[in-house]
């Protein structure tokens, strides 16, 4: 499955919720009527979706939200299933620990896609070492920083300004002036993404 490169608002409308694929400074809230499906007049939603359909849609929503393709998503689920505790919550913990997501959460990228690009282009370091793998798993206590030669990028400054306005999550500690932040801990399930029903994904993969 290739990575989707089309209109971001269309994906959010398809899932019926904001996937945060576009920067808040270019909000899609006015353009994407989340209760209206893509199409000239939107698809009717009078027919009842099957349990399988609901499970599949939830998986697609989370994959798109975090920018992960099927093969890798399946590996994350298998890793989550091996861990102790709730498999669904474990899955979200794995996704939240991806380097591109942490860069986004720290405000260095205004979207996960922009954060992924920063990582791929070697603009970020982890504990002083250059890492260009978006799926790199960040651990509690790791320090994520913008490389010196990348600190003058306008998009990073704009993203940090936006993050300053909307606030940062409690599990990261960021020094915007230094261009670095600490991943304090993997967030608890009740700290993020209330619009995700991970139990549907567990049910899907357990079929």
Curated annotation (Swiss-Prot):
Residues 42-52 have a biased composition (Polar residues). Residues 97-160 form the S4 RNA-binding domain. One of its GO terms (biological process) is ribosomal small subunit biogenesis. Keywords: Ribonucleoprotein, Ribosomal protein, RNA-binding, rRNA-binding. Pfam families: Ribosomal_S4 (PF00163), S4 (PF01479). Residues 29-38 have a biased composition (Basic and acidic residues). Gene3D superfamilies: Ribosomal Protein S4 Delta 41, Chain A, domain 1 (1.10.1050.10), RNA-binding S4 domain (3.10.290.10). One of the primary rRNA binding proteins, it binds directly to 16S rRNA where it nucleates assembly of the body of the 30S subunit. With S5 and S12 plays an important role in translational accuracy. NCBIfam families: PRK05327.1 (NF003717), rpsD_bact (TIGR01017). This is Small ribosomal subunit protein uS4. Disulfide bonds: none annotated. Residues 29-54 are annotated as: Disordered. The keyword Transmembrane helix does not apply. Part of the 30S ribosomal subunit. Contacts protein S5. The interaction surface between S4 and S5 is involved in control of translational fidelity. Coiled coil: none annotated. InterPro entries: Ribosomal_uS4 (IPR022801), Ribosomal_uS4_bac-type (IPR005709), Ribosomal_uS4_CS (IPR018079), Ribosomal_uS4_N (IPR001912), S4_RNA-bd (IPR002942), S4_RNA-bd_sf (IPR036986). Belongs to the universal ribosomal protein uS4 family. The keyword rRNA-binding applies. PANTHER family: 30S 40S RIBOSOMAL PROTEIN (PTHR11831), SMALL RIBOSOMAL SUBUNIT PROTEIN US4M (PTHR11831:SF4). One of its GO terms (cellular component) is small ribosomal subunit.
């Amino acid at each position: 499955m290739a990575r989707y490169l089309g209109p971001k608002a269309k994906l959010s409308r398809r899932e019926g919720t904001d996937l945060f694929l576009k920067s808040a400074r270019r909000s899609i809230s006015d353009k994407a009527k989340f209760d209206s499906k893509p199409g000239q007049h939107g698809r009717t939603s009078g027919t009842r979706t099957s349990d399988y359909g609901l499970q599949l849609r939830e998986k697609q929503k989370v994959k798109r939200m975090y920018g992960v393709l099927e093969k890798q998503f399946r590996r994350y689920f298998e890793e989550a299933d091996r861990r102790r505790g709730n498999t669904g919550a474990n899955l979200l913990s794995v996704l939240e620990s991806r380097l591109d997501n942490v860069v986004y959460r720290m405000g260095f990228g205004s979207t996960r896609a922009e954060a992924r690009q920063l990582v791929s282009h070697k603009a970020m370091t982890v504990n002083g070492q250059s890492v260009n793998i978006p799926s790199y798993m960040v651990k509690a206590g790791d320090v994520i920083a913008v490389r010196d030669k990348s600190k003058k990028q306008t998009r990073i400054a704009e993203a940090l300004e936006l993050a300053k306005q909307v606030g940062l999550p409690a599990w990261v500690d960021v020094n915007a002036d230094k261009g670095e932040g600490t991943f304090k801990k993997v967030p608890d399930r009740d700290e993020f993404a209330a619009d995700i029903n991970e139990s549907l994904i567990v049910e899907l993969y357990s079929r």
